[in-house]
Amino acid sequence: MPGMVLFGRRWSLASDDLVFPGSFELFLRVLWWIASLTLYLMHRRKLDCPGGVLLSTYLIVLLVLLAVIIGIVLAIVCVSMRGTICNPGPRKSMSKLLYIRLALFLPEMVWASLGAAWVAKGIQCDRTVVIGIIATVIVSWIVIAATMVTIVFVFDPLGGKMAPYPPCIPEHLDSNSSNHLLTGLRTAAKSVWETRVQCCCCCIGQDDNTRVAFSSTADLFSTYFSDTDLVPSDIAAGFTLLHQQQDKISHSREPSEVVTHTPGQPQETELDAEVENCHHYMPFSPVCSPWPVCVLNSSRVELCRTGNNFCRGRDIEYDAVEGDEHHCHFASILKTTGLQYRDFIHVSFHDKVYELPFIVVLDHRKESVVVAVRGTMSLQDVLTDLSAESENLELDIELQDCVAHKGIAQAARYIYRRLVNDGILSQAFSVAPEYRLVVVGHSLGAGAAALLAIMLRGAYPQVRAYAFSPPRGLLSKSLFEYSKDFVVSLILGMDVIPRLSVANMEDLKRRILRVIANCNKPKYKILLHGCWYSVFGGSPDNFPTELDEGNQGALTQPLLGEQTLLTRCSPGYCSGDSPLDSPKYPTLYPPGRIIHLEEEGGSGRFGCCSAAQYRARWAHETEFSKILIGPKMLIDHMPDVMIRALDRVVADRTACVSCPGQGGSNVP
């Protein structure tokens, strides 16, 4: 629901968000009241000492004050449980209760201060009583400090400008005035988001690229949230409902409704070859990671010992290692890949915004020069990811609409300049002129690898790219079709990154609004049931995802409840409009042909990948046009999880080579 309006400004807190914090405070206050009452009843006869009257008065007033606070907090919790997310009517008294509760902090602070002052006088009373009162004073200040921290977290810097959110532009304003007002609001929102991003990334250097990335990221966030009035708990409830709704639809689907496709023998043979290639090249993708990550991903304990030996004493004879002063990262690469010094042409750990680490190595087994690009491992990489505007690419190919993700395109362009202008590829092919060029990467590195292959194809027509878990919002339609000839993308399970794009995020926002508007359960029940369902499973029919009268089709229609969660920013606003529907954020696609590793059966809610069974199949990009919500949406993106899944798929397919019937079922 819309954020509450208190003291004339909007806060990032809804009136139904106080069930859990209120219950926790209620539990704490009741225990505190019981302990204080017990202390007073058991030791009141010992309060006839000098200063004991002050302590007795302190305890009596504290008990009365706690009783009043307990009553108010209980009322807040009960009122917060009423209604639904889109029906705040039963909670209209919440603001008055909060004003009373906040007013009670004043006598509580005064009494805690007096208690501290009286105890500090060195009153000569029973030691147990004094310690008990000191404890109550400490608890009082802890509760007050926690409340102040909570207020800071729920404070909305834009609340004074945008509270309450207007349902529409005031009618007395002409178009120029309304445009001026909206421009001011957007500028303020972007400024707030830019400050937030800078605070989160305060430890990285400030150069021109970083400042541009800050601006792009702030523009994306401010634009995305500009037409909604949701608080964080609403989004969490929406995720919970979408997860259960997905499972409910999946469970209710008849077997005949599941579309399967059995490819012809040439396609299946090609799939086997490409899966084997992915299995071979995937370990190259994360090798540019910092050495602690490689140690964590390695099952060999000696890697730590070997890495430390390299860090302490060995001088690397190569001058091709860049940005690794103590050679720890390079030592981990040697152990994880099993390659020799002579196989490395160039290793760069240089990491800045729009500038990614990469390696160039000779792969003698596949007779290829491998360029591996690192994925997201730093705040600089996150800023590169979030620079989601599109920009035109200047390519020597006859294609129209050559547009790509701005941040990833600039990162690919940086690596291209290093490879070509610095002669790194020329050096590699002077050593092995008969080898072919292969570009690989994972996550952010996958997107950069695909774009790098597109840029290099004019000079290296035989280039191949393997993009592991690439972001969806990468290429325009024409570049997507063009890349199918030489780029293969591998996606595991419910991985969220290959489904992540500006368009998909906008679709996710609309789905959240609709499922919230359709749900007739209070938010606290949604969150409780959702946590239980995510951890322990169960039937989604038992949870609050059902629509009134079971009408699933209603989710496609705008609802009154949905409209209450939208901020209409112009007189011409309608529910289908979006501030992200602009040339700055066109629809973008993933790179190349897609191999999807699907989990067969289940391995538990958070099951280990080694216990799961997977099948590989060719997939269409439209299958990844919607973000799926589930426990594995992040786990399936991890490189080590993908490597183990590939190990299992390759082992199963190899074992079934002599079993055509079983092998065919592995490729729907």
From Swiss-Prot:
Cofactor names: Ca(2+)
Disulfide bonds: none
Enzyme class: hydrolase
Pfam assignment, any one: Lipase_3
GO cellular component, one term: plasma membrane
PROSITE patterns recorded: LIPASE_SER (PS00120)
Residue numbers bearing the Phosphoserine modification: S570, S578, S582
Domain of life: Eukaryota
Catalyzed reactions: a 1,2-diacyl-sn-glycerol + H2O = a 2-acylglycerol + a fatty acid + H(+); 1-octadecanoyl-2-(5Z,8Z,11Z,14Z-eicosatetraenoyl)-sn-glycerol + H2O = 2-(5Z,8Z,11Z,14Z-eicosatetraenoyl)-glycerol + octadecanoate + H(+); 1,2-di-(9Z-octadecenoyl)-sn-glycerol + H2O = 2-(9Z-octadecenoyl)-glycerol + (9Z)-octadecenoate + H(+); 1-(9Z-octadecenoyl)-2-(5Z,8Z,11Z,14Z-eicosatetraenoyl)-sn-glycerol + H2O = 2-(5Z,8Z,11Z,14Z-eicosatetraenoyl)-glycerol + (9Z)-octadecenoate + H(+)
Transmembrane intervals: 18-38, 59-79, 103-123, 129-149
Topological domain ranges for the Cytoplasmic compartment: 1-17, 80-102, 150-668
Entry EC number(s): 3.1.1.116, 3.1.1.3
SUPFAM superfamilies: alpha/beta-Hydrolases
Major subcellular site: membrane
Keyword field: Calcium, Cell membrane, Hydrolase, Lipid degradation, Lipid metabolism, Membrane, Metal-binding, Phosphoprotein, Transmembrane, Transmembrane helix
One example of a Gene Ontology biological process annotation: arachidonate metabolic process
Active site: S443 (charge relay system), D495 (charge relay system)
Gene Ontology terms, MF aspect: lipase activity; metal ion binding; monoacylglycerol lipase activity; triacylglycerol lipase activity
Activity regulation (UniProt): Inhibited by the 1,2,3-triazole urea covalent inhibitors KT109 and KT172. Inhibited by p-hydroxy-mercuri-benzoate and HgCl(2), but not by PMSF. Also inhibited by RHC80267, a drug that blocks 2-AG formation.
Entry's localization field: Cell membrane
Similarity section: Belongs to the AB hydrolase superfamily. Lipase family.
Job of this protein: Lipase that catalyzes the hydrolysis of arachidonic acid (AA)-esterified diacylglycerols (DAGs) to produce the principal endocannabinoid, 2-arachidonoylglycerol (2-AG) which can be further cleaved by downstream enzymes to release arachidonic acid (AA) for cyclooxygenase (COX)-mediated eicosanoid production. Preferentially hydrolyzes DAGs at the sn-1 position in a calcium-dependent manner and has negligible activity against other lipids including monoacylglycerols and phospholipids.
Protein name in the entry: Diacylglycerol lipase-beta
Species for this entry: Rattus norvegicus
Organismal lineage: Eukaryota, Metazoa, Chordata, Craniata, Vertebrata
Gene behind the chain: Daglb
